[in-house]
Regions:
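Basic- and hydrophobic-enriched, low-structure N-terminal and domain-boundary segments
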Residues: 1-192, 199-200, 204-207, 211-215
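Glycine-rich phosphate-binding loop of nucleotide-binding enzymes
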Residues: 159-254, 418, 422-425, 451, ...
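Short loop/turn elements that form and flank the Walker-type P-loop nucleotide-binding site
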Residues: 183-185, 215-218, 363-365, 400-403, ...
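Conserved beta-strand position immediately N-terminal to the Walker
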Residues: 187, 370, 440
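P-loop NTPase motor domains
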Residues: 206, 228-239, 255-430, 434, ...
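Hydrophobic residues in beta-strands of the RecA-like P-loop NTPase core, especially within AAA+ ATPase
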Residues: 224, 409, 442-443
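Conserved ATP-driven motor cores of ASCE-family P-loop NTPases powering translocation/secretion/packaging/pilus
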Residues: 429-511
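Conserved P-loop NTPase motor module
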Residues: 493-537
Length: 537
């Protein structure tokens, strides 16, 4: 039988170093017998750890602590912090002043989620992380995780750097990088307005450009930008054109005449012959009769010249007769088609098309940016749907020399919702990975995305969601358990993220690089570093 040490022996040490954080008389004696200012595991089970810290010290939600137990280090992530004490009842509202209670009897209780464990010996940590299947010994020492205790993560990170590991409110020097090999398994970026989605995408694209310039790219990235944020940037920052060392890995097309004088930018042109009747379905709410007429076009007219034919009087008559629809229906359809052509000046009746160059760019592993400011939402979706169709048609044919492809969709709930009229992106979500085509869905409202489609996404970047229904949809669809991180997701600040992907051992708290700072680091003259600590906004 172990004899408990005399409590008086440790009285002064206890008060000066731990401020008397206690629970019961037996635990009080045990804790006081352990020198140093580290804290101790007190409870609970394999799903949750609890320890206490002085009442005037802080522990952040999301902060990672380590628990030392013999030759192992257990890692645990804070999910909640509570005021607690050894007093009974509502003592804190029934007293006045500070003379009526003992500071050694009040403390903060920290509840932490176990993440896993690694060897204490640094030389044995490589590839040694594993899930914890037991609990640390009671009263094992607890301390805030140090930078070197995250070194094991470097071996699990990918090649597309996006930020650094964030431990609570502190940034570490461990780079956070996504995996090129996972990009055809789809990625979701979820955040409310102002949380840094556009900055994340510019950082992501910059890393892809760097890899392509070094001949290390595994996929091409297609971005259709309806807001003009990525090409030149804007008042608040810079764009991809400012990343001079890697412009050879960027192909730019624009509908904005102001950009056509730039040597790096080509005018976006789409030939009428590129368009199929199914492509224009997204541009209007068609009646049943008009939809029947559209679906009849492909069997009545030549596959590539149908637009020119239907605009001709003879073509209109042929469609009326063979599709068995009224002249009024055909007249309305033709007027809508003429309206589409007049509003989308990049659609040309003759001349070359940008689509072959776009497809060649993604197949060679480059970042292809299509800048379409001032176009309507329907025109944006039409263009993205058309290009995505052509990409899928190309990628269905085997080609060992090409790279995989990722298609970025802004406001993805418009095309991945259960009531969406656009089947093109649903097809990519369900079947794209078989052919090496992935989606990057950006949205503020993941709750509007079809559950089954969202479950196809293996990588999720969560940058703050205020709506509980949005968080629930992401949590139930993620490949890692995010349910315990609900409070942390609510408290994320601009530029902070939780990244969930099967290639890392647990959901990673990250600070995303500020694009303008990351640009400076990517300059060839900049000193080489394994990671980057971003300048706060």
């Amino acid at each position: 039988v172990h004899q408990l040490p005399d409590i008086t022996k440790f009285k002064d040490e206890w008060r000066s170093e731990t401020k008397g954080i206690v629970l019961s008389s037996a635990e009080r004696i045990m804790v006081k017998s352990m020198p140093g200012n580290a804290y101790r595991i007190l409870a609970k089970d394999v799903r949750s750890y609890e320890f206490v810290i002085p009442y005037d010290e802080k522990a952040d939600v999301g902060e990672i602590f380590t628990v030392e137990d013999r030759d192992m280090l257990f890692l645990a992530r804070v999910v909640n912090v509570q005021h607690d004490s050894n007093y009974d009842g509502r003592w804190d509202t029934s007293i006045r002043g500070t003379e009526l209670y003992d500071e050694e009897q009040i403390f903060n209780r920290v509840i932490a989620e176990p993440l896993g464990c690694i060897p204490r010996d640094q030389t044995k940590r490589r590839g040694a992380f594993r899930k914890a299947k037991t609990i640390p010994t009671k009263f094992s020492r607890v301390k805030r995780a140090e930078a070197e205790e995250f070194d094991f993560l470097k071996d699990t990170m990918g090649d597309i750097e996006v930020g650094v590991l964030r431990n609570g409110s502190r940034d570490t020097d461990v780079a956070v990088a996504l995996h090129s090999s996972a990009m055809d398994h789809h990625m979701g970026i979820f955040a409310t307005t102002g949380m840094g989605k556009s900055n994340f995408m510019k950082v992501f694209a910059a890393s892809c450009m760097k890899l392509a310039s070094e001949n290390r790219s595994e996929f091409g990235l297609l971005i259709v930008d309806p807001h003009g944020e990525y090409l030149r940037g804007g008042k608040a920052g810079k764009g991809l054109l400012h990343l001079k060392p890697y412009l050879s890995s960027l192909k730019c097309y624009s509908t904005d005449p102001r950009n056509h004088s730039l040597p790096e930018v080509s005018e976006l042109t789409i030939s009428r012959r590129d368009i199929l009747p199914e492509d224009i379905k997204v541009l209007h709410d068609w009646t049943g009769a008009q939809m029947d007429a559209l679906e009849s076009i492909e069997r009545i007219f030549d596959g590539e010249s149908w637009i020119d034919e239907i605009l001709d009087e003879n073509g209109k008559a042929m469609l009326t007769e063979k599709a068995k629809v009224s002249e009024k229906t055909v007249d309305v359809l033709v007027r809508k088609l003429e309206n589409i052509l007049s509003r989308n000046k990049y659609i040309k009746s003759s001349g070359s098309s940008s689509i072959p160059g776009i497809i060649e760019g993604v197949k060679s592993g480059k970042v292809v940016l299509i800048d379409i400011p001032n176009l309507s939402e329907s025109s944006e979706l039409f263009l993205l749907s058309l290009i995505s169709r052509r990409i899928m048609e190309d990628y269905r044919n085997e080609d060992e020399g090409r790279k995989k492809c990722m298609v970025v969709i802004e406001e993805a709930q418009r095309v991945l919702g259960s009531d969406s009229r656009i089947a093109r992106f649903e097809e990519i979500a369900r079947e794209g990975r078989k052919f090496g085509v992935g989606l990057c869905a950006i949205t503020q409202q993941p709750k509007l995305i079809d559950r089954e489609l969202l479950s196809q996404f293996n990588t999720m970047v969560v940058m703050g969601l205020a709506d509980r229904n949005d968080r629930m949809r992401v949590e139930e669809s993620a490949k890692q358990d995010l349910s315990s991180l609900d409070v942390e997701i609510q408290t994320l600040e601009k530029g902070e993220a939780i990244i969930s992907t099967l290639n890392v051992p647990f959901p990673i708290p990250a600070k995303i690089h500020r694009y303008e700072d990351y640009m400076e680091r990517l300059r060839p003259s900049a000193p080489e570093r394994r990671s980057f600590r971003p300048t706060p906004d």
